[in-house]
Amino acid sequence: MGLFDKLKSLVSDDKKDTGTIEIVAPLSGEIVNIEDVPDVVFAEKIVGDGIAIKPTGNKMVAPVDGTIGKIFETNHAFSIESDSGIELFVHFGIDTVELKGEGFKRIAEEGQRVKVGDPVIEFDLPLLEEKAKSTLTPVVISNMDEIKELIKLSGSVTVGETPVIRIKK
């Protein structure tokens, strides 16, 4: 890369030049600080850093282009690796594993290639609001050791559309 290429990349708005990766909302709702999740594993960032979403919709979608890693047997959580190497973990609610799959329906499969917005899991929000300890849904990056900068966004988000996190590797 020559001097002019370097200067051009510094002043360009093109995401490819700046190396910024956007994570899009895997579900609709309101962004909440990860530290406010009523589970120490997420609040203390033991499994990674990120945000949580107080959900308003009925589906979880792929937040990045990539490959579905694991979908829990109870369909309440999934992992995905982005094409750029970001490993994400989306976990609906707290203690939702105890519902043994009630209120969740798997749409995607493990190992499936997905694009941003492709449905992964559908859920019954009224049922889960009644039965789960919390519906706050952590969205965390599990390979934080590879991340240089993490910018957490805030506000209301629309599933498959609104960015929730910006990352520089």
From Swiss-Prot:
Positions of Zn(2+) binding: 76, 91
Gene Ontology terms: biological process: phosphoenolpyruvate-dependent sugar phosphotransferase system
The record's free-text note on cofactor binding: Binds 1 zinc ion per glycerol kinase EIIA-Glc dimer. The zinc ion is important for dimerization.
Residues carrying Phosphohistidine: 91
Coiled-coil ranges (or none): none
Organism: Salmonella typhimurium (strain LT2 / SGSC1412 / ATCC 700720)
Any one Gene Ontology molecular-function term assigned to this protein's record: metal ion binding
Cofactor(s) the record lists: Zn(2+)
Top-rank taxon, per record: Bacteria
Domain PTS EIIA type-1 residue range list: 39-143
Presence of keyword Zinc-finger: no
Name under which the protein is recorded: PTS system glucose-specific EIIA component
Further comment: Two forms of III-Glc (called IIIGlc Slow and IIIGlc Fast) are present in living cells. IIIGlc Fast, derived from IIIGlc Slow by cleavage of the seven NH2-terminal amino acids, is present only in trace quantities and has slight activity (only 2-3% of phospho-IIIGlc Slow) in the phosphorylation of sugar. Both forms accept phosphate from phosphoenolpyruvate via Enzyme I and HPr, however only IIIGlc Slow participates in the phosphorylation of glucose or methyl alpha-D-glucoside. IIIGlc Fast may play a role in the regulation of non-PTS sugar transport systems.
UniProt site (Important for phospho-donor activity): 76
Subcellular location: Cytoplasm
Gene that this polypeptide is encoded by: crr
Keywords assigned: Cytoplasm, Kinase, Metal-binding, Phosphoprotein, Phosphotransferase system, Sugar transport, Transferase, Transport, Zinc
InterPro entries: Dup_hybrid_motif (IPR011055), PTS_EIIA_1_perm (IPR001127), PTS_EIIA_component (IPR050890)
Cellular-component GO terms for this entry: cytoplasm
Disruption phenotype: In mutants defective in enzyme I and histidine-containing phosphate carrier protein (HPr), cells lacking this gene are able to grow on the non-PTS compounds such as glycerol, maltose, melibiose, mannose 6-phosphate, and alpha-glycerol phosphate.
Subunit annotation: Heterodimer with glycerol kinase (glpk).
Physiological role: The phosphoenolpyruvate-dependent sugar phosphotransferase system (sugar PTS), a major carbohydrate active transport system, catalyzes the phosphorylation of incoming sugar substrates concomitantly with their translocation across the cell membrane. The enzyme II complex composed of PtsG and Crr is involved in glucose transport. It can also phosphorylate mannose, methyl alpha-glucoside and 2-deoxy-glucose. The non-phosphorylated EIII-Glc is an inhibitor for uptake of certain sugars such as maltose, melibiose, lactose, and glycerol.
